Amino acid sequence: MNTFTRAALTVLVGLVIWFLPHTEAIKPEGWHLLAIFTATIVGFILRPWPTGIMALFGIVAAVVTKSITMVQALGGYAEANVWLIVAAVFFSRGIINSGLGKRIAYTLIRSFGTSSLKLAYALACTDLIISPATPSNTARGGGIVFPIVQNISLAFDSEPYGNTARRIGAYLMTTAHTINTITVTIFLTACSGNLLITSLGAKLFGYDISWWEWFQAGVIPGVICMILMPWFIYKIYPPEIKETPEAAVMAQKELDALGPITKAEISVAIIFVLCILLWATAIWTKLHPTVVAMMGVLACVVTGSLTWEDILGERTGWDILIWMGTLVGMAGLLGKLGVVAVFADFVSQHLAGFDWFWASFIISATFVYSQYFFASGTARITALFSAFAAILVAMGAPIPFTILLFGLMNSPGCTLTHYSSGVTPIFFGAGYVPQGTWWRVGLAISVVSFLIHFWGGTFGMWLFGIL
């Protein structure tokens, strides 16, 4: 479809909902905002223009139609969680600039990369180590891990689009992408979608999920998947090359090229560790996670690891500010205007007598496998989280459990297609894995991941007293 067709469909969806009859329990301005919000989501999916532009269209439409005021329209930009992810994206630029991420990766490969399976675990550890401070999994996967995977593959004469792709490149690309989707489960600050979920949850239910609560819910399924997935993929989609002694030599050459560890790397490493400690101990220090992230950014600037020009040029952070501020603001207003509550009550009445825990299993599976219809995790969260979460809460599910459950379910769907998340086209686009194979292997990974995340996450929440 061309731009005009996609834009026309977006507007058409909004107009249809606008003029549909609705219950008197929803005020006209609430219904009109729902129409605009839905059209904005459709715009995110069809993308006649970039996400940030579609978000601005949503704000303008809501204000022009007097569905909300200008102050209300901009209220989402004052949300602390929105600024948390923006600040964390800026901090991740300091990690990339310093070269610390590459040094960690090549050090692990030099030490443990004697086989293709061990190489996969070394790459997994790299992603895990840097994920708490890189909330853009696209930047983490595409900017740090992917180039390393590509270099390793080419070093073993594993070329894309040919007979040599299966030598090692296809396996490493698949595994690195899968791990990138798993680390987002463990740390709240490892993915923008996580903070979108907690922001929407806070707006709808008035409950703020802490960094530590997220870690408690995600660490058990996350660690299980981190250990299991490289081996599982090795079994269902094995590389032709099993032993890789040359990898250590290649890694040493890369480390030699990087030279001795720099002051910038040391300072970023110290700041990185301190930020994680402060996030993890916020329950005692009372420091808001957003303040901690901003402290990390300022520390990077003071130590010279980051400049104001770097911050101004970090397009991902500013883009997130625009679209996430819009979504969080609109979702909060839909809650205040009673739209979400009316919908949740209607659905829960039709599910009366159905146990909320088993309903959460079914709704979680629906949430995960709906990813086939969305071109990003963000679009799926935006479209489904508020409604699905409200239904579960109306059925009796605890609010913290509900919010964290959807956080856990953000991961399994990201392996399903070659367009499931922002980082997916980078690994798929390398040309090592055919589309049909990507979908087939991705489905197998997703099923295992879903079961581990649901049952492991539920056990973790029970173990730590959240459930």
Describe the predicted segments one by one.
Residues 1-19, 100, 137-141, 156-259, ...:
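Juxtamembrane and boundary regions of transmembrane helices in multi-pass small-molecule transporters
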Residues 1-2, 24-32, 44, 71-80, ...:
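Interfacial loop-to-helix junctions that mark the boundaries of transmembrane helices
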Residues 7-8, 33-34, 38, 52-56, ...:
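Hydrophobic alpha-helical transmembrane segments
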Residues 8-16, 38-42, 60, 64, ...:
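Generic alpha-helical transmembrane segments of integral inner-membrane proteins
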Residues 22, 52-162, 314, 318-320, ...:
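Membrane-embedded alpha-helical segments and adjacent helix-loop junctions characteristic
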Residues 23-31, 38-56, 73, 226-227, ...:
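Flexible hinge motifs at transmembrane-helix junctions and intramembrane kinks/re-entrant loops
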Residues 25-35, 79-90, 287-297, 347-359, ...:
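Structural signature of hydrophobic alpha-helical transmembrane segments
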Residues 41-50, 126-136, 177-188, 278-284, ...:
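Transmembrane alpha-helix interface/packing and boundary motifs in multi-pass membrane proteins
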